[in-house]
């Protein structure tokens, strides 16, 4: 595919221009013109990628997803999906960001009519940011109350019927008391219904009732609205956004330094919790329960779909952070090594988090004298703010300390993720308006993020969170990831893309990457997306269906996100007419003059490199039909021959 309106210049000797000029300590400098700052060093980039990819999804989402989809058997489809979809997408986004030194919208100079993919991903990122900050608020709330002499969720309030104290020393007595209260509540006239014979009566732990009644003040019906924001959670939300702003206000200069702590500290706490968890009674049963494979689930297409969703959620691909982080690299940074480290570490952390969490849940089941651990397992926010606190309150030694460590770890994990997501939006805006100050854009977007987050700290906030995550996050991200891959690999061309990688990394692209990008990754994603849409069911929260208005609102959110792709494509074609409509359409599928390395001298060398590659291929083209056939196969697979 040819480049339009770009004059070819003589090649530089090193092929990388001033991008390779570094000081003796390996510090990375901005490109000429000061248009883009670089990371202080390569380790800051690696730590930043770890902090966003190793996040809340590893600690509470992966364990439950694995448990629900075959236990240990889930690891097989997850690892297969990781190698065929996760790693290829992650590496592709790192490459495209570093090669162009642009954010997730500006990179689409590679295929201008696909500009809407970048804006659609930005919309999905805003949706994720809006509810992610509310999870930070909940985490911060629990962190603050953990400093009390008695953990507030460990005991029942007088007004809570059918409540069981979470404190182990109170369990036996409160269990009997709760049973008596439940039985007495079933008295109807002179008739008494036995508790044992009534399945509708369910005992609840004090940690569950504390979360539902005290923290979020849950509404089970939002037909009359979601209610007003809770002032305590609003304050926690404000603190979360202040911390986020302070981390990102100076761009990679500040976030790069914070990344060391954001990436390393959670591992320290996770290993401390693991050491404590495996020594608890019942921990082994919990770990076995987590890892024990259910082989029959491997034939369930839903398991493979969940593996893909978990992979995307965990690695943060197709949302913009990976492209954004890589865009601040030197042009010749060793990106392959970092991609392999992060994707491998992400998987190992998920396993570590799963073992730790289910060891704690095994102890919880042991203390509650429950044979089936399924009865103490919850998903999503329930797992983080009900099951974990309930288990921690049963620790015999200083439960407050472990509670503080655990929720501070969750807060740090969340900050690492939201810093990356928020920086993505700020970078997109600053790339569009280069005269705008980075810190001012960061401040305004942080204020907007806080205002958007207020809806999630209302009594009906968990309903909205479920809705936005499902329609505005998961499905929008997934479908745009397919278009992202198609635009780069199928429209721009895998051969062109592999040439760009060879120029930047100074080595050929392996067959594994070429086959994944050209065939396995897009085909698997398309099949899984079609299956997901064909089997989609009405959305529920806490086993309750959303009202019709909620479903309509969700589909509107989905439509807004996905409509960015065709709408921006139409806009670009209409503003860049080149002949008739068909000629304009074809022209807008080709890279424009902005595509290529950001450094002018590097770009000159790249253009000559591409011309030489084209000349070599032309000279090797065979005249026979068989030769032409294999030449087409090579082009499709990105072969440089």
From Swiss-Prot:
Membrane recorded as keyword: yes
Cytoplasmic side: 1-38
GO BP terms: amino acid import across plasma membrane; D-amino acid transport; neutral amino acid transport; sodium ion transport
UniProt cross-references to InterPro entries, sorted A to Z: Na/ntran_symport, SNS_sf
Cross-referenced PROSITE patterns: NA_NEUROTRAN_SYMP_1, NA_NEUROTRAN_SYMP_2, NA_NEUROTRAN_SYMP_3
Glycan attachment points: 181, 190, 198
Compositional bias (Polar residues): 1-21
SUPFAM superfamilies: SNF-like (SSF161070)
The protein's name in its UniProt record: Sodium-dependent nutrient amino acid transporter 1
Organism: Drosophila willistoni
Gene name linked to the record: NAAT1
């Amino acid at each position: 595919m040819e480049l339009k309106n770009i004059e070819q210049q003589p090649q530089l000797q090193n092929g990388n221009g001033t991008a390779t000029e570094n000081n003796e300590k390996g510090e990375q400098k901005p490109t000429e013109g000061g248009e883009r700052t670089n990371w202080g060093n390569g380790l800051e980039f690696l730590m930043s990628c770890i902090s966003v990819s190793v996040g809340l999804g590893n600690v509470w989402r992966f364990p439950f997803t694995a448990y629900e989809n075959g236990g240990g058997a889930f690891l097989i489809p997850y690892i297969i999906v990781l190698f065929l979809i996760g790693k290829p997408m992650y590496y592709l986004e790192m490459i495209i960001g570093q090669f162009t030194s642009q954010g997730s919208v500006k990179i689409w100079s590679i295929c201008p009519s696909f500009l809407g993919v970048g804006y659609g991903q930005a919309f999905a990122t805003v949706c994720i940011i809006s509810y992610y900050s509310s999870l930070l608020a909940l985490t911060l709330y629990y962190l603050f109350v953990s400093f009390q002499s008695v953990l507030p969720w460990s005991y029942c309030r007088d007004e809570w019927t059918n409540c069981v104290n979470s404190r182990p020393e109170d369990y036996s007595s409160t269990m009997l008391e709760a049973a008596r209260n439940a039985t007495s509540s079933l008295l109807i006239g002179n008739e008494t219904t036995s508790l044992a014979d009534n399945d509708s009566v369910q005992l609840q732990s004090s940690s569950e009732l504390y979360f539902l009644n005290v923290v979020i003040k849950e509404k089970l019906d939002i037909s009359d609205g979601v209610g007003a924001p809770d002032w305590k959670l609003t304050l926690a939300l404000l603190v979360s956004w202040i911390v986020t702003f302070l981390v990102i206000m100076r761009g990679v200069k500040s976030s790069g330094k914070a990344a060391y702590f954001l990436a390393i500290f959670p591992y320290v706490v996770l290993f401390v919790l693991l050491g404590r968890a495996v020594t608890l009674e019942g921990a082994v049963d919990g770990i076995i329960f987590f890892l024990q494979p259910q082989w029959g689930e491997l034939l369930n297409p839903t398991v493979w779909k969940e593996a893909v969703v978990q992979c995307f959620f965990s690695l943060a691909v197709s949302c913009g952070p990976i492209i954004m982080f890589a865009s601040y690299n030197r042009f010749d940074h060793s990106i392959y090594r970092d991609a392999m480290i992060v994707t491998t570490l992400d998987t190992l952390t998920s396993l570590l988090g799963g073992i730790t969490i289910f060891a704690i849940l095994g102890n919880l089941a042991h203390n509650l004298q429950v044979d089936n651990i399924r009865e103490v397992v919850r998903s999503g926010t329930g797992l983080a703010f009900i099951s974990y606190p309930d288990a921690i309150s049963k620790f015999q030694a200083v439960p407050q300390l472990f509670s503080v460590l655990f929720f501070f770890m969750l807060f740090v994990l969340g900050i690492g993720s939201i810093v990356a997501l928020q920086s993505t939006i700020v970078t997109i805006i600053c790339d569009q308006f280069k005269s705008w100050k980075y810190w001012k854009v960061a401040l305004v977007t942080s204020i907007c993020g806080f205002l958007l987050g207020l809806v999630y700290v209302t009594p009906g906030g968990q309903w909205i969170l479920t809705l936005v995550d499902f329609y505005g996050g998961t499905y929008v991200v997934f479908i745009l990831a397919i278009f992202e891959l198609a635009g780069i690999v199928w429209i721009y061309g895998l051969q062109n893309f592999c040439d760009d990688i060879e120029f930047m990394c100074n080595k050929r692209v392996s067959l594994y990457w070429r086959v994944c990008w050209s065939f396995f990754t897009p085909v698997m994603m398309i099949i899984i997306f079609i299956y997901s849409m064909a089997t989609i069911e009405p959305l529920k929260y806490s086993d309750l269906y959303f009202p019709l208005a909620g479903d309509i609102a969700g589909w509107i959110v989905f439509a807004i996100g996905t409509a960015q792709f065709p709408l921006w494509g139409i806009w670009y074609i209409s503003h860049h007419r080149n002949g008739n409509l068909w000629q304009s359409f074809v022209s807008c599928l080709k890279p424009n003059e902005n595509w290529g390395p950001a450094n002018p001298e590097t770009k000159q060398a790249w253009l000559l490199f591409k011309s030489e590659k084209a000349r070599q291929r032309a000279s090797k083209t065979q005249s026979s039909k068989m030769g032409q056939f294999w030449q087409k196969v090579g082009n499709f697979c990105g072969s440089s021959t």
